[in-house]
Amino acid sequence: MAGNYHSFQNPIPRYQNYNFGSSSSNHQHEHDGLVVVVEDQQQEESMMVKEQDRLLPIANVGRIMKNILPANAKVSKEAKETMQECVSEFISFVTGEASDKCHKEKRKTVNGDDICWAMANLGFDDYAAQLKKYLHRYRVLEGEKPNHHGKGGPKSSPDN
């Protein structure tokens, strides 16, 4: 939905067991205002979203940045890390919008058409138009049929 911004930067993990007791051996963590008490180290480690699972590989981000810049340009570690955060957040933002659409349509698979729709719905119309052209060319080259039924997902997909 245009205008509704989601933040996926630090998603709250789904906790199975809350223990709001005050045992001194417990560890307390705060996630967006929610204090969660963890009973042991193993449970604590399983709840944390690993940074490498949340972010694109920094080497890939750096390589893309270097390809855009003049050959003699340098990119600082801070610039790579900042861009890594930005692009990872952007991907989560667009994918979340596409996923919401699929959920409303009772589909499990997010496809390229859903991503194009999400980009346009979020106000990135120019990018969505170019992405649609690219997706069409990709499908032609791969021998796939373009999606023209308007729902955003292929009719023959087994999980739709």
From Swiss-Prot:
For this UniProt record, the keywords arranged alphabetically read as follows: Activator, DNA-binding, Nucleus, Transcription, Transcription regulation
Q: Which GO terms describe its molecular function?
A: DNA-binding transcription activator activity, RNA polymerase II-specific; DNA-binding transcription factor activity; protein heterodimerization activity; sequence-specific DNA binding
Which subcellular locations apply to this protein?
Answer: Nucleus
* Region annotation Subunit association domain (SAD): where it falls in the sequence: 83-94
* Keyword flag DNA-binding: yes
DNA-binding region listed in the record: 56-62
CDD domains given in the database record: HFD_NFYB (cd22907)
Tissue occurrence? Expressed in flowers and siliques.
Magnesium: is it a keyword of this entry?
Answer: no
Family from the record: Belongs to the NFYB/HAP3 subunit family.
**Protein's recorded name:** Nuclear transcription factor Y subunit B-5
- The organism is Arabidopsis thaliana (Mouse-ear cress)
Gene expressing this chain? NFYB5
